[in-house]
């Protein structure tokens, strides 16, 4: 009865949304190209019984990389189909996951569409990153006796409240999942409270600690800096994954800081690239020099060329490597009540990390990171300003903070192997797949 009600409502909403889908298909090429896949119409390039991994967006795609590489190392002949929800996640997967044999958009969660996609893919297992719960996808995959594993599972306090409110529904969805591999004990407690079978839950850690990035040589670092228009004498303040309401604060702070730090450059990376025009309006209003990264001319960063005050990072999938250029890093989504973003990424480069008061999405990690001396949390604009001023003048404090953060990161690695060992029994026979 619950699924019948859901499907009636979903069908009704899908009909209502069809004019919008048609309009977007006409005006937006990327949406037009993705729509057939979302409707379950695509050609499969994989053989029978591939591993189906679903990673909703960019963050989930990146955190899936260590596990996917480990699976391919053990089962080199296994074919992998990866689906994403967002176009940015899709592009990121195609760029950073050569191990995936096919990258598609996840089917719209209508029973007819999902059934069509399952018959096309014919997976031997479905692995879902974090907590992307599509009711019909879960129900129909399980109906085919295909095991479903939720890996790197997490439930934020905000999401938990929503799940609890609709517990009667999500409890029915969770019964189709074979195994829950959760990040923390708190995540395990929450998923059980929502309705997961305690016997099917494990705490195995967080794959985000196991992400790997290239170790850049000094020459490569200089080349990357030059592409950003940097000459080597600048201090660089990177604000990553920023949201509306934060850019005004950060640009204003940067203007103030430049009065005492004339060579300070702000690299601003909005979380959503469709907001770039909005951010540019703020920059014009603040009367600062700025440029999009992709508009910087070849050879930018020459000795006689001053870089712009603000560089807008307008490319996808480059933020984590760009962090390597930073003197100081601010993690966005935390000065406004968004819930924050992953504070671990800059730590791979031993960077000095700051974030605001709103870190609900990474509450446990942020608390433990602060306790380890690996990051600084500020209450708002004024404290952020004072901490930035202090750290810009104190190289030793920056180095100690970055080193402590890196040690914290290393201490919590190992989730990949633990998850793989839990999933491995479901992959028996994969070595024989051709």
In which residue ranges do the predicted regions lie?
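Nucleotide-activated sugar donor-binding and catalytic core shared by glycosyltransferases
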Residues: 1-434
């Amino acid at each position: 009865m619950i699924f019948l009600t859901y499907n009636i409502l979903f069908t009704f909403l899908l009909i209502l949304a069809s004019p919008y889908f048609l309009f977007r298909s006409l005006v937006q090429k990327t949406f037009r190209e993705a729509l057939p896949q979302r409707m379950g119409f695509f050609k499969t390039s994989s053989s029978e019984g591939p591993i189906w991994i679903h990673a909703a967006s960019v963050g989930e795609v990146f955190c899936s990389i260590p596990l996917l590489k480990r699976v391919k190392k053990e089962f080199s002949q296994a074919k992998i189909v990866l689906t994403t929800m967002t176009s940015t996640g899709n592009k990121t997967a195609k760029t950073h996951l050569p191990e995936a044999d096919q990258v598609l958009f996840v089917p719209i969660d209508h029973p007819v569409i999902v059934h069509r996609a399952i018959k096309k893919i014919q997976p031997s297992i479905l692995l879902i990153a974090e907590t992307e719960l599509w009711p019909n996808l879960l129900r129909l995959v399980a109906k085919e006796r295909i095991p479903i594993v939720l890996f790197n599972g997490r439930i934020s306090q905000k999401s938990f409240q929503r799940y609890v409110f609709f517990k009667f529904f999500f409890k029915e969805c969770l019964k189709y999942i074979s195994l829950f591999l959760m990040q923390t004990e708190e995540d395990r407690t929450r998923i059980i409270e929502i309705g997961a079978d305690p016997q099917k839950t494990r705490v195995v850690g967080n794959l985000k600690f196991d992400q790997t990035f290239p170790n850049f040589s000094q020459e490569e670092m200089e080349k990357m800096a030059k592409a950003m228009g940097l000459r080597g004498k600048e201090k660089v303040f990177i604000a990553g994954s920023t949201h509306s309401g934060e850019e005004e604060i950060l640009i204003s702070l940067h203007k103030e800081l430049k009065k005492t730090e004339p060579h300070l450059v702000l690299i601003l990376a909005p979380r959503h690239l469709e907001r770039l025009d909005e951010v540019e309006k703020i920059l014009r209003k603040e009367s600062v020099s700025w440029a999009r990264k992709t508009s910087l001319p070849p050879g930018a960063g020459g000795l006689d060329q001053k870089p712009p005050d603000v560089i807008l990072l307008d490319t996808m999938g480059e933020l984590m490597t760009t962090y390597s250029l930073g003197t100081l890093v601010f993690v966005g989504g935390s000065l406004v009540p968004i819930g924050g973003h992953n504070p671990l990424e800059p730590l791979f480069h031993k960077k000095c990390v700051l974030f605001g008061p709103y870190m609900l999405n990474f509450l446990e990690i942020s608390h433990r990171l602060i306790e380890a001396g690996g990051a600084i949390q500020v209450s708002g604009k004024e404290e952020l300003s004072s901490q930035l001023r202090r750290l810009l003048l104190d190289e030793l404090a920056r180095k100690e903070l970055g080193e402590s953060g890196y040690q914290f990161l290393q201490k919590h690695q190992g989730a990949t192997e633990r998850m793989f060992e839990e999933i491995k029994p479901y992959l028996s026979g994969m070595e024989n797949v051709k």
